[in-house]
Amino acid sequence: MFAIFPIFAFAQDNSQTTPCSSPESAQMDFWVGEWNASWQDNEGNTKTGTNTISKILGGCALQENFSTSDGSFVGKSFSVYNTRKGYWEQTWVDNSGAFLSFTGGPNGDKVILSREVNTKDGRHIMQRMIFSDIKPDAFTWDWESSTDDGTTWNLNWRINYTRKN
Protein backbone atom coordinates (compact mmCIF):
# COMPACT_ATOMS: atom_id res chain seq x y z
CA MET A 1 0.00 0.00 0.00
CA PHE A 2 2.81 2.43 0.77
CA ALA A 3 4.39 1.76 -2.60
CA ILE A 4 1.19 2.82 -4.38
CA PHE A 5 0.63 6.02 -2.37
CA PRO A 6 3.53 7.96 -3.92
CA ILE A 7 2.13 7.30 -7.39
CA PHE A 8 -1.24 8.86 -6.46
CA ALA A 9 0.40 11.73 -4.60
CA PHE A 10 2.61 12.48 -7.60
CA ALA A 11 -0.38 12.41 -9.98
CA GLN A 12 -2.37 14.99 -8.02
CA ASP A 13 -2.64 18.52 -9.35
CA ASN A 14 -1.58 20.80 -6.53
CA SER A 15 -2.52 24.05 -8.27
CA GLN A 16 -4.96 26.39 -6.59
CA THR A 17 -7.21 26.63 -9.66
CA THR A 18 -10.77 25.56 -8.99
CA PRO A 19 -11.87 22.91 -11.48
CA CYS A 20 -14.13 24.25 -14.21
CA SER A 21 -13.63 27.89 -13.19
CA SER A 22 -12.51 29.15 -16.60
CA PRO A 23 -14.74 31.64 -18.44
CA GLU A 24 -15.23 29.01 -21.16
CA SER A 25 -16.76 26.64 -18.62
CA ALA A 26 -19.55 29.19 -18.09
CA GLN A 27 -20.38 29.69 -21.79
CA MET A 28 -23.49 27.48 -21.58
CA ASP A 29 -24.78 28.83 -18.24
CA PHE A 30 -27.62 30.61 -20.09
CA TRP A 31 -29.11 27.13 -20.56
CA VAL A 32 -29.24 26.20 -16.87
CA GLY A 33 -32.78 26.18 -15.46
CA GLU A 34 -36.26 24.85 -16.10
CA TRP A 35 -37.72 25.45 -19.54
CA ASN A 36 -41.02 25.08 -21.38
CA ALA A 37 -40.53 23.94 -24.97
CA SER A 38 -42.89 24.30 -27.95
CA TRP A 39 -42.62 23.39 -31.63
CA GLN A 40 -44.69 22.57 -34.70
CA ASP A 41 -44.89 18.96 -35.85
CA ASN A 42 -44.92 17.98 -39.55
CA GLU A 43 -48.67 18.61 -39.76
CA GLY A 44 -48.40 22.08 -38.19
CA ASN A 45 -49.75 21.06 -34.78
CA THR A 46 -48.18 22.69 -31.73
CA LYS A 47 -46.35 20.23 -29.50
CA THR A 48 -44.90 20.93 -26.07
CA GLY A 49 -42.43 19.57 -23.59
CA THR A 50 -40.10 20.50 -20.78
CA ASN A 51 -36.37 20.61 -20.38
CA THR A 52 -34.43 20.94 -17.14
CA ILE A 53 -30.73 21.72 -17.25
CA SER A 54 -28.69 21.41 -14.04
CA LYS A 55 -25.06 21.98 -13.16
CA ILE A 56 -23.65 18.75 -11.72
CA LEU A 57 -20.32 17.31 -10.62
CA GLY A 58 -19.24 20.42 -8.75
CA GLY A 59 -20.37 22.68 -11.57
CA CYS A 60 -18.12 20.94 -14.10
CA ALA A 61 -20.89 19.45 -16.24
CA LEU A 62 -24.44 20.19 -17.38
CA GLN A 63 -27.15 17.55 -17.25
CA GLU A 64 -30.17 17.91 -19.53
CA ASN A 65 -33.51 16.15 -18.95
CA PHE A 66 -35.90 16.58 -21.90
CA SER A 67 -39.42 15.18 -22.17
CA THR A 68 -42.37 15.72 -24.47
CA SER A 69 -45.57 16.55 -22.60
CA ASP A 70 -47.08 13.17 -23.47
CA GLY A 71 -43.90 11.35 -22.40
CA SER A 72 -43.45 9.68 -25.79
CA PHE A 73 -39.94 11.09 -26.24
CA VAL A 74 -37.51 11.38 -23.33
CA GLY A 75 -33.81 12.08 -23.45
CA LYS A 76 -30.79 13.18 -21.46
CA SER A 77 -27.54 14.85 -22.28
CA PHE A 78 -24.32 15.56 -20.46
CA SER A 79 -22.22 18.52 -21.57
CA VAL A 80 -18.77 19.61 -20.44
CA TYR A 81 -16.17 22.11 -21.56
CA ASN A 82 -13.06 20.12 -22.39
CA THR A 83 -10.19 22.41 -21.38
CA ARG A 84 -7.58 20.17 -22.99
CA LYS A 85 -9.32 20.22 -26.38
CA GLY A 86 -10.67 23.77 -26.11
CA TYR A 87 -14.31 23.05 -26.96
CA TRP A 88 -17.59 21.76 -25.57
CA GLU A 89 -18.53 18.09 -25.79
CA GLN A 90 -22.05 16.70 -25.38
CA THR A 91 -23.41 13.18 -25.28
CA TRP A 92 -27.14 12.65 -25.87
CA VAL A 93 -29.13 9.46 -25.17
CA ASP A 94 -32.88 8.90 -25.45
CA ASN A 95 -35.69 6.36 -25.33
CA SER A 96 -35.35 5.65 -29.06
CA GLY A 97 -31.97 4.08 -28.36
CA ALA A 98 -30.01 7.01 -29.79
CA PHE A 99 -26.49 7.80 -28.63
CA LEU A 100 -25.15 11.01 -30.19
CA SER A 101 -21.88 12.83 -29.51
CA PHE A 102 -21.37 16.50 -30.35
CA THR A 103 -18.58 19.06 -30.19
CA GLY A 104 -18.57 22.82 -30.54
CA GLY A 105 -19.30 25.98 -28.63
CA PRO A 106 -20.01 29.68 -29.08
CA ASN A 107 -19.95 31.03 -32.62
CA GLY A 108 -20.76 34.74 -32.63
CA ASP A 109 -24.06 35.21 -30.80
CA LYS A 110 -25.00 31.53 -31.18
CA VAL A 111 -23.86 28.25 -29.69
CA ILE A 112 -23.35 25.45 -32.23
CA LEU A 113 -22.72 21.81 -31.37
CA SER A 114 -22.24 19.46 -34.31
CA ARG A 115 -21.38 15.94 -35.39
CA GLU A 116 -20.74 13.96 -38.55
CA VAL A 117 -21.95 10.43 -39.26
CA ASN A 118 -21.76 7.89 -42.05
CA THR A 119 -24.92 5.89 -42.60
CA LYS A 120 -24.99 2.14 -43.20
CA ASP A 121 -25.47 2.81 -46.90
CA GLY A 122 -22.36 5.02 -47.00
CA ARG A 123 -23.94 8.48 -47.01
CA HIS A 124 -22.11 11.24 -45.09
CA ILE A 125 -24.41 13.40 -42.96
CA MET A 126 -23.55 16.47 -40.92
CA GLN A 127 -25.88 17.38 -38.04
CA ARG A 128 -25.88 20.37 -35.74
CA MET A 129 -27.88 22.00 -33.01
CA ILE A 130 -27.93 25.77 -32.87
CA PHE A 131 -28.88 27.81 -29.82
CA SER A 132 -29.80 31.29 -31.08
CA ASP A 133 -31.67 34.46 -30.14
CA ILE A 134 -30.43 33.80 -26.60
CA LYS A 135 -32.08 35.99 -23.95
CA PRO A 136 -32.30 35.53 -20.16
CA ASP A 137 -35.77 33.96 -20.42
CA ALA A 138 -35.93 32.53 -23.95
CA PHE A 139 -33.95 31.09 -26.83
CA THR A 140 -34.45 29.19 -30.08
CA TRP A 141 -32.99 25.73 -30.65
CA ASP A 142 -32.64 24.39 -34.19
CA TRP A 143 -31.73 20.86 -35.29
CA GLU A 144 -30.27 20.90 -38.79
CA SER A 145 -28.70 18.41 -41.17
CA SER A 146 -26.63 18.56 -44.34
CA THR A 147 -25.93 15.88 -46.93
CA ASP A 148 -23.60 18.06 -49.04
CA ASP A 149 -20.78 18.69 -46.54
CA GLY A 150 -22.40 21.82 -45.12
CA THR A 151 -23.08 23.70 -48.35
CA THR A 152 -26.79 23.69 -47.53
CA TRP A 153 -28.58 22.93 -44.27
CA ASN A 154 -32.09 21.57 -43.75
CA LEU A 155 -34.06 22.61 -40.69
CA ASN A 156 -35.42 19.40 -39.14
CA TRP A 157 -36.77 20.70 -35.83
CA ARG A 158 -37.14 24.14 -34.25
CA ILE A 159 -37.94 24.39 -30.56
CA ASN A 160 -38.83 27.68 -28.89
CA TYR A 161 -37.79 27.72 -25.25
CA THR A 162 -39.19 29.95 -22.50
CA ARG A 163 -37.96 29.85 -18.95
CA LYS A 164 -40.41 28.57 -16.34
CA ASN A 165 -41.24 31.01 -13.54
Predicted regions and their residues:
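Bacterial N-terminal signal peptides
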Residues: 1-6
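Hydrophobic small-molecule pocket/channel-lining residues, especially in calycin-type beta-barrels
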Residues: 10-165
